[in-house]
């Protein structure tokens, strides 16, 4: 007899992509309508800008389906506007919004997207846009491909995170790509992430590139801390990815709970001191794939910064977000788009 998913925490978050994908191409600024095809290999030149020079951007979205009602797609308009920012930063043609939403909806409508390689009520959606031109030199691509992949997601309570404070490498510098969701933002992470895992940590804590003192992000998650009576999160700048989960948490905290949310720089020194004097009571991360997760510890060279284990604010915010996504609470801010599953 198989255990319910919640009791199998050793299973990975994802296994593989759903069997079908959506695809559209852009020639000279004209996009084809989205087509459906078997998820798999595409004919692509190895010199394509997307492969050779990292001209590639993506999104990560989420949808819920209870198996009966229409599927609930979360904040797709926000994902589209971030995709526009990312494409523009890399000088790429942007898929029109209608095409983008249609391709995502097609994926959700297909019941097999939710059932293979394993059945799930939550679908992770990965739109990708990449340059197809195969120039010898790094020139922005005129021919561009847009694909929408999906993958069923496993949800169950996960262990609090242990973060490795990265004092040598940096994620993003001022004027760089940190605020755009580009593949290039991930290329530099493999080595630091591997080192963090070697040190027994789950993820990298990224600090600012200039001083390595200010907290920016945790791997691919935004960061929140409860300090005194305030929910504090690093202020957005071009070195920080503007997470949609981050934004949703801020809205929930402010508008539903009247909690004061402050966006400002947070240093590691302040965090260590605020834990010491008892004013820092909670720390957690926010992202689409991992949703909201607590931080247990930051390993910073020889010292360990340990966080309190009780997380009442985090628990409340996570429940609120989950209830909206699942249709168990009012969609007060119009975050949900319903898509019938055929
Ligand atoms: C995608 C991403 C996030 C989280 O953003 P969400 O919109 O909440 O999923 C945070 N940091 C980085 C670097 C990311 O790529």
Name the predicted role of every residue range:
Residues 99-122:
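Non-catalytic accessory segments adjacent to catalytic cores
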Residues 19, 111-112, 127-132:
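Active-site loop/lid in soluble adenylation, ligation, and acyl-transfer enzymes
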Residues 5, 116-130:
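Extended, Lys/Arg-enriched charged tracts that mediate electrostatic binding to polyanionic substrates
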Residues 1-107, 134-342:
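Helix-start/capping segments and mature chain N-termini
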